[in-house]
């Protein structure tokens, strides 16, 4: 099956190479754009990184169309980085819908910079994709919903796979299956030598469920629901 055919299958909510997607507006729009041109010939199987980029871009499209963010604001990437991803992985017409010529680069705030630094410190050496994902994850982690949802992924399992692949030492430290955003902030606190938690141990903490709950919710549920964490 060609990469384009796989994306079409994914956009219809089918199971393809173990990856499932629901019929979200951003993904529908992205898959419709893919019909306008040929998918660049790569490996027979759809690369997981490429799939994640497509998920993130579909989520960004939803925010762009809603007037909530520009492409750079939604992804944490620069114009140059976004253009490079689109040129390498998507047909030419896809670029125009992101309106890159109309936007400016979005600089990270202090909190985002700390998250980005944490991820970069554990990024896979010499992998440019890991750097891009560090920026994307740091930006999307500032949103209020589950991190996997804010990345446009199908479920938390896909997020765990992404982190294990690109930030292996960081992911390996989450031995108790802590929710990822909670885990990130715990690591930041540890690096600064203090803790936000006043309980002597996790089992005695009243926030136990918020830190160690499944974080699943409904897989690929409609975007816009807030209040959860991955």
From Swiss-Prot:
Q: Which Pfam families match?
A: NifQ
Swiss-Prot/TrEMBL keywords: Molybdenum, Nitrogen fixation, Plasmid
List the GO molecular function terms. molybdenum ion binding
Gene Ontology biological process terms, A to Z = nitrogen fixation
Query: Could you list the residue ranges that cross the membrane?
Result: none
Q: According to the lineage, what is the superkingdom?
A: Bacteria
Q: Family, per the entry?
A: Belongs to the NifQ family.
Record's function text? Probably involved in molybdenum processing.
Q: What is this protein called?
A: Protein NifQ homolog
């Amino acid at each position: 099956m060609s990469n384009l055919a796989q994306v079409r299958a994914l956009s219809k909510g089918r199971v393809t190479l173990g990856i499932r997607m629901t019929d979200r507006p951003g993904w529908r729009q992205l898959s419709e754009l893919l019909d306008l041109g040929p998918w660049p010939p790569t490996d027979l199987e759809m690369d997981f990184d490429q799939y994640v980029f497509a998920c993130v871009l579909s989520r960004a499209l939803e925010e762009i169309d809603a007037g909530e963010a520009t492409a750079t604001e939604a992804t944490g990437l620069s114009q140059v980085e976004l253009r490079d991803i689109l040129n390498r992985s998507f047909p030419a017409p896809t670029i125009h819908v992101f309106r890159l010529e109309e936007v400016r680069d979005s600089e990270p705030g202090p909190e985002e910079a700390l998250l980005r630094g944490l991820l970069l410190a554990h990024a896979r050496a010499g992998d440019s994709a890991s750097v891009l994902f560090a920026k994307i994850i740091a930006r999307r982690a500032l949103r209020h919903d589950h991190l996997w949802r804010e990345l446009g992924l199908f479920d938390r399992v896909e997020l765990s796979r992404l982190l294990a692949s690109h930030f292996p030492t960081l992911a390996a430290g989450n031995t108790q299956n802590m929710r990822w955003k909670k885990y990130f902030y715990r690591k930041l606190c540890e690096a600064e030598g203090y803790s936000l938690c006043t309980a002597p141990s996790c089992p005695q903490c009243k926030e136990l469920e918020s830190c160690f709950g499944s974080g699943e919710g409904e897989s690929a549920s409609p975007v816009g629901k807030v209040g959860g964490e991955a």
